[in-house]
């Protein structure tokens, strides 16, 4: 038809004419065509923004709308052009930082709209200055997985003694989440100014000691990047320090942290070494010298328990004597292992750590852990080390929900050992509420259960709830953004956590909205590479909250009371003396809440939002006489908001925390709180009818350091008197003397019902002083499948004791064994062993 020899423009004209001719022919001809013209598809209306572009000094919430019926709106906030793959609009968009918002509308039967764009310059007020912290309760802990935080020294990325375990793309595009990625102690040191800017009180670093040096898994790699597969607890891992496994990088980190007023908490593993039958086969070294492997551990006094994997995590015997996930399970009551583990903790203390997070304490021998706490309580240390005066802070991991069978055991363990717990029971509710949008009543019910107080006599109540370590994300569970929280949800969770009772812990990267949802976001995908260290709306919020914790003792040490609640709204109050902080959170994404009937301890007056509306908060007016139920004038609590109202006032002597909570006479303790006065008053210990004043080595308005006086062992209280005012009586457990672990075994037990437990009680406080209740007696005794009973108890070294076993029945009644009391003399050192037969 055509000869193709035209230029590009000419060809376009010819083809257009040809197309028109073919169209006319298909319509039945030329000028006589009477068919309708082609239909033109209309374009959807351009989206409208509820807030005009411009500069603002408060947080803005922008609603999007479109006049096209049934339109869907997609938007971006990162400067990219929106498409149908962008975020689908569902609720007003909170803006707390300068943002360019772009939106596109789509609708069935319409072409996509034009893109609407608006730039919002948000210049929020600077956060208040953060005062110097005298106690960890006044700030928050920042948890770091060292390998995933920052690479500060590339020379240790692929060390020769453990070559081939490094992914060079880990921080950019990881190929293997089980390899080392390069984060190290030098990297944390180099980011100290970032941590200080947020008001971090302490960093909790993953175990820094030497881990296995070979692949312990299949070809895809299994390494100890996380720190929980130790081989030598006396050396620093070469990936975190240097090839000499020296302490230089660790010491540098501690020095830098202390210079910025930040404490260092080391994660410590006492339960196990490393995988059995793979890698290094449960290798155990002592400062470079091989002690044993799992397979060669065949002596008369084995270092390990050679037992099956735990199959029932609510079985007391399995937990303490079986194997956790094929990791070589240390026998803490082997005398060498006992001294090795305690020596490793003292070694870390001598290198400047300020406390420990104890891994898997539910799976370690419970009775031995009492003696480990006592060893740390009796550590004297160098006066140049902060932990020598502000005593080491201990907390441990016991995964248990309040509805689980061993929850009462966990409460008893914490109350009587002096080891604080990670508040896992509260965590489960926080993950539900902020991650899965469940009702706030879950949190409130949990707090009511846990915080009933030691005087309640219930097996559910913690003696010192303000010592529990709280969190909503960690390295073992999916981050709440994976569970469903958006950025505002994370900030609301932060707001709750940092104003709730307890010592709050933020997981690294939460402030940068870090998450990876692969595999449900659990291990290892919750151990992401830290991608940013910049300031944003979340770091600003943290600064506000850190300043509040530091400045107002009600948040660090006060009581906590629910004031108003429904599924989406939680209003609660912290109080210490005349210091009051009232917090209101509305997590509903679209509905404001009318608040009526709210009472408060805040004095009458008008209160602006402490957060300066950076979380969409509002002001309130309090009326009535000063008291516990001052009415708040009805007000509207905005959706997706957090409001905080603060009153700062006087406070008499008030004890918030004692560290440690259990110690023997002669040990040093730190009493923290407020209102102690600048001049020394009187610090008193009361046990039974006896009250003895303690000699204070340090006295300030918020902290006292003193030596436990010679006083009767057992449950005691501590008070501070300043002038005519005396503080609350804080619970304290006085140990008789230095403790060591003793294995008590009993054979010939009577037949037991499903609700029976075997307990031990005896002649000293550490054996229960002949008490018979669940909380008073010692135990329950573990029941090996081979028969009999086994229980490790930490008792006074060198003591002569008497004791008996008893059966505590489900109805509270007791059956003692018959006959005379058993007698034993406890050795002066090491580990004791006492075996008896049940007396019928």
Which sequence ranges carry the predicted segments?
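Bacterial Sec-dependent N-terminal signal peptides
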Residues: 2, 15-46, 124-126, 130
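Active-site-proximal helices and loops of the catalytic beta/alpha 8
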Residues: 253-262, 272, 343-350, 354-464, ...
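Surface-exposed, short loops/turns at beta-strand junctions within beta-sandwich domains
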Residues: 93-99, 710-714, 796-799
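Short, compositionally stereotyped local motifs that mark structural "simplifiers"
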Residues: 36-126
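Substrate-binding/active-site clefts of carbohydrate-active enzymes
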Residues: 133-140, 147-351, 371-384, 389-407, ...
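Aromatic-rich carbohydrate-binding modules that target alpha-glucans
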Residues: 81-87, 750-800, 808-827
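Beta-strand/beta-sandwich contexts
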Residues: 649-680, 725-737
């Amino acid at each position: 038809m055509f000869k193709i020899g035209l230029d590009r423009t000419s060809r376009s004209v010819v083809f257009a004419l040809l197309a028109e001719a073919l169209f006319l022919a298909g319509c039945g001809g030329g000028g006589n065509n009477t068919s309708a013209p082609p239909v033109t598809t209309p374009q959807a209306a351009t989206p409208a923004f509820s807030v005009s572009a411009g500069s603002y000094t408060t947080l803005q919430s922008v609603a999007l709308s479109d006049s096209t019926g049934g339109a869907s709106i997609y938007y971006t906030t990162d400067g990219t052009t929106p498409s149908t793959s962008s975020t689908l609009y569902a609720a007003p968009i909170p803006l707390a930082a300068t943002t360019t918002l772009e939106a596109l509308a789509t609708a069935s039967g319409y072409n996509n709209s034009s893109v609407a764009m608006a730039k919002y310059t948000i210049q929020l007020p600077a956060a208040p200055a953060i005062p110097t912290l005298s106690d960890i309760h006044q700030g928050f802990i920042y948890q770091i997985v060292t390998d995933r935080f920052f690479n500060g020294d590339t020379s240790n990325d692929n060390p020769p003694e453990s070559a081939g375990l490094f992914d060079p793309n880990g921080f950019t595009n990881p190929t293997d989440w089980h390899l080392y990625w390069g984060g190290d102690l030098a990297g944390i040191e180099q980011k100290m100014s970032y941590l200080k800017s947020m008001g971090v009180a302490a960093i909790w670093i993953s175990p820094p000691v030497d881990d296995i040096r070979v692949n312990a898994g299949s070809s895809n790699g299994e390494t100890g990047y996380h720190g929980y597969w130790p081989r030598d607890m006396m050396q620093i891992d070469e990936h975190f320090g240097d090839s000499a496994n020296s302490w230089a990088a660790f010491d540098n980190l501690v020095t830098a942290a202390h210079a910025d007023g930040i404490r260092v908490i080391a994660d410590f593993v006492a339960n196990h070494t490393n995988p059995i039958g793979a890698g290094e086969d449960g290798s155990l070294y002592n400062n470079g010298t091989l002690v044993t492997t799992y397979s060669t551990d065949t002596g008369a006094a084995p270092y390990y328990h050679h037992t099956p994997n735990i199959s029932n995590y609510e079985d007391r015997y399995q937990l303490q004597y079986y194997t956790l996930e094929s990791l070589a399970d240390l026998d803490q009551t082997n005398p060498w292992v006992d001294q090795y583990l305690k020596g490793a903790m003292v070694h870390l203390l001598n290198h400047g750590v300020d406390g420990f997070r104890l891994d898997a304490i539910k799976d370690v021998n419970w009775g031995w852990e009492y003696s480990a706490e006592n060893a740390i309580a009796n550590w004297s240390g160098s006066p140049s080390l902060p932990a020598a005066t502000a005593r080491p802070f201990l907390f441990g991991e016991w995964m248990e929900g309040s509805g689980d069978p061993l929850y009462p055991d966990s409460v008893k363990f914490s109350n009587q050992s002096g080891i604080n717990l990670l508040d896992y029971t509260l965590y489960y509710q926080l993950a539900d509420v902020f991650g899965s949008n469940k009702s706030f009543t879950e949190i409130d019910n949990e707090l009511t259960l846990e915080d009933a107080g030691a005087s309640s006599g219930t097996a559910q109540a913690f003696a010192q709830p303000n010592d529990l370590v709280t969190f909503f994300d960690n390295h073992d569970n999916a981050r709440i953004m994976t569970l469903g929280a958006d950025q505002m949800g994370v900030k609301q969770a932060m707001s709750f956590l940092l104003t709730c009772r307890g010592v709050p812990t933020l997981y690294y990267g939460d402030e940068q909205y870090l998450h990876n949802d692969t595999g449900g976001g659990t291990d290892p995908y919750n151990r992401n590479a830290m991608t940013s260290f910049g300031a944003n709306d979340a770091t600003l919020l943290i600064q506000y909250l850190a300043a509040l914790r530091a400045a107002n003792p009600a948040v660090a040490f006060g009581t906590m009371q629910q004031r108003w609640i429904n599924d989406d709204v939680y209003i609660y109050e912290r109080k210490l003396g005349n210091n009051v902080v009232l917090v209101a959170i509305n997590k509903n994404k679209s509905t404001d809440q009318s608040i009526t009937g709210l009472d408060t301890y805040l004095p009458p007056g008008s209160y602006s939002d402490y957060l300066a509306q950076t979380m969409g908060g509002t002001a309130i007016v309090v009326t009535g006489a000063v008291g516990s139920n001052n009415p708040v004038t009805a007000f509207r609590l905005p959706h997706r908001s957090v409001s905080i109202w603060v009153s700062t006032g006087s406070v008499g002597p008030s004890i918030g925390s004692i560290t440690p909570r259990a110690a023997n006479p002669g040990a040093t303790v730190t009493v923290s709180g407020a209102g102690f006065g600048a001049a020394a008053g009187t610090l008193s210990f009361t046990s039974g009818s006896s009250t003895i004043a303690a000699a204070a080595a340090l006295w300030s308005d918020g902290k006292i350091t003193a030596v436990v006086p010679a006083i009767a062992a057992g449950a005691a209280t501590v008070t501070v008197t300043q002038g005519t005012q005396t503080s609350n009586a804080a619970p304290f457990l006085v140990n008789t003397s230095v403790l060591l672990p003793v294995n008590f075994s009993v054979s010939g037990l009577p037949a037991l019902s499903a609700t029976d437990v075997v307990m031990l009680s005896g002649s000293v406080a550490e054996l229960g002083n002949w008490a018979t209740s669940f909380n008073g007696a010692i135990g329950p005794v573990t029941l090996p499948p081979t028969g009999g009973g086994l229980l490790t108890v930490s008792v006074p070294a060198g003591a002569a004791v008497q004791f008996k076993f008893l059966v505590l029945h489900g109805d509270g009644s007791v059956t003692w064994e018959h006959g005379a009391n058993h007698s034993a003399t406890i050795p002066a050192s090491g580990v004791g062993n006492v075996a008896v037969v049940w007396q019928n």
